């Protein structure tokens, strides 16, 4: 058991990208932030499922070519092998939780 303070962690790309609060052998938990217009390249996972839960702002998550526009309170589940791409097409920052 352990406790993590978000303030002790940093976003991968300065003010954006994933901020991993926990990386383990069976699961990762991250706070993800994108500024307006920022994106994360298309990719997939061979074994892991990924979930995104939107906390603030709006984001487009493209899964196998289908655009899913998500708002706070919505979650998307991505299966292994599904190619996904994340882009903040809004004019404001967005924040979401990622479990992987």
Where are these regions (language model features)?
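Short acidic-glycine-tyrosine-enriched beta hairpin
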Residues: 65-80
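Short strand-connecting beta-turns/loops that link adjacent beta-strands
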Residues: 26-27, 47, 91-92
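Ligand-binding loop in jelly-roll beta-barrel domains
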Residues: 80-100
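Well-ordered beta-strand scaffold positions
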Residues: 25-27, 58, 66
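Histidine-centered metal-chelating micro-motifs
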Residues: 39-41, 60, 76, 80-86
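Glycine- and acidic-residue-biased ligand/ion/polar-headgroup-sensing regions
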Residues: 47-49, 53-59, 64
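A short, N-terminal "cap"/entry segment at the start of jelly-roll beta-barrel domains
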Residues: 1-28, 41
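Conserved short histidine dyad/triad with adjacent acidic residue
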Residues: 30-45
